[in-house]
Amino acid sequence: TSPHHKLSCGYAIKDLNGDGVDELVLLTDDYMVCAIFSITDGKPILLGNYRTRHSAWIDEKGWIHENGSGGADNSMNAVYKIADGGASIELIAEFGTNGHEWIGDTAYTKYYKLVNGEKVSITESEYFALNEQYTKYLGTHAGAEATKNYSNLTFISLYTEAEIAMEMYEAVLKNEIKV
């Protein structure tokens, strides 16, 4: 990867659930959430880590919204809140798509919601109602934009301005990035 990718790494510190314990959010400068940590008994606790096909965003309540994909036929949307004390996250809702069902020559998407740990079939309209209620911002970049606009997180770069300038300058000299 080129040097400008690592320069976008940073963090934010905020009490996401209002329990008096700050969480550490690792994220990029465009607010793509990479990982969320809390502290319990003086030790860091990883609450979640995320990547391109399994992304997350944080809303104004401090809730964590995950969007994942296991391929074209399967998707998952989940919403969590951080438990008081920060030791874990609690599932508020999970729903998604679970493959297709063929009836004749037509494939129909199968929708589900999680109830007591089990995937329960739901209708398309129920799926879209859950989607509207919990995940209005689908997709990796839309989620990052939602985190930026609604979470009240403040990005802090891992690098100083001088380090960023030097890395960018060296990358230009090596022809790794164009200006």
Model-derived segments and spans:
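Blade-edge motifs of beta-propeller repeat domains
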Residues: T1-H5, K43-S55, V179
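A glycine-rich, hydrophobic loop/mini-helix early in the fold
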Residues: P3, L7-G10, D22
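Beta-propeller blade termini
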Residues: L7-L16, H54-W63
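Acidic/hydrophobic-patterned starts of short beta strands in beta-sheet-rich repeat architectures
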Residues: N17-T28, G62-N67
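Loop/turn residues immediately N-terminal
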Residues: D30-A35, N74-N77
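Beta-propeller blade repeat segments, especially FG-GAP/WD-type strand-to-loop junctions
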Residues: V33-G48, I82
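Extracytoplasmic/secretory soluble proteins
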Residues: I36-S38, W57-D59, G96-H100
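Acidic, small-residue rich beta-repeat scaffolds with periodic aromatic anchors
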Residues: N67-V179
